[in-house]
Regions:
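Hydrophobic beta-strand-centered segment that forms part of the acyl-chain substrate-binding groove
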Residues: 5-15, 82-118, 143, 151
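Terminal leader/tail segments of proteins
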Residues: 28, 36-38, 44-47, 59, ...
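Flexible, low-complexity linker/boundary loops enriched in proline and small hydrophobic residues
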Residues: 2-38
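Active-site helix/loop of acyl-thioester processing domains in fatty-acid/polyketide metabolism
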Residues: 37, 69-92
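Beta-strand-rich interaction surfaces with strong enrichment in secreted/lumenal proteins
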Residues: 22, 65, 107-109
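Hydrophobic beta-sheet segments that form the core/acyl-binding groove
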Residues: 37, 102-141
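Catalytic strand-loop segment that frames the active site of acyl-thioester-processing enzymes
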Residues: 29-69, 87
């Protein structure tokens, strides 16, 4: 388990559902990869959820006989979950968060059709440049971890 695994059992203070996520993000189907965001009291920790149904187009080619969620799609899920979560902060009203860079990413386990991806998020530094640490979990445990950077613009 990763350092943010405690969030998997943490009581959720507020759930952000799809209509509010769509207000926070410019993404739309078929490229919206966050179903729900969970907020925990303080603005430091958050969680994004995404269920992979197996009907996503990328499974047809990655891989036809053994479908696996591509690692870049897991990173995109992380980025979208972060964007949707941090934009719930009232201090950021009227601003936008843009995914800027990946400091590192490590892929530990596969994510398969039917898996519920739980993305645990920690804000390491907030401001114009916001630094995030994220861990993605499925029922099999920690599958991906990454440090991501975002720029907040007016």
């Amino acid at each position: 388990m990763g350092k943010l695994s405690f969030l998997l059992k943490e009581p959720v203070e507020y759930i952000v559902e799809r209509p509010v996520i769509e207000e926070a993000l410019p993404h739309r189907d078929p490229f919206l990869f966050v179903d729900e965001v969970h907020l925990f009291g303080e603005q430091r920790y958050m969680m994004g959820l995404r269920r992979f149904t197996g009907r996503e187009a990328f499974f047809r080619g990655h891989f036809p006989n053994y479908p696996v969620v591509p690692g870049v799609m897991i990173l995109e899920c992380m980025a979208q979950a972060v964007g949707a979560a941090i934009m719930q902060n009232p201090k950021l009203k009227g601003k936008e968060a843009f995914f800027m860079s990946i400091d590192y990413a490590k892929f530990r386990k596969q994510v398969r059709p039917g898996d519920l991806l739980k993305i645990a998020i920690e804000v390491l530094r907030s401001g114009k440049i916001t630094k995030i640490y994220a861990e993605a979990y499925t029922h099999n445990g920690l599958c991906t971890e990454a440090e991501l950077n975002f720029i907040i613009v007016d």
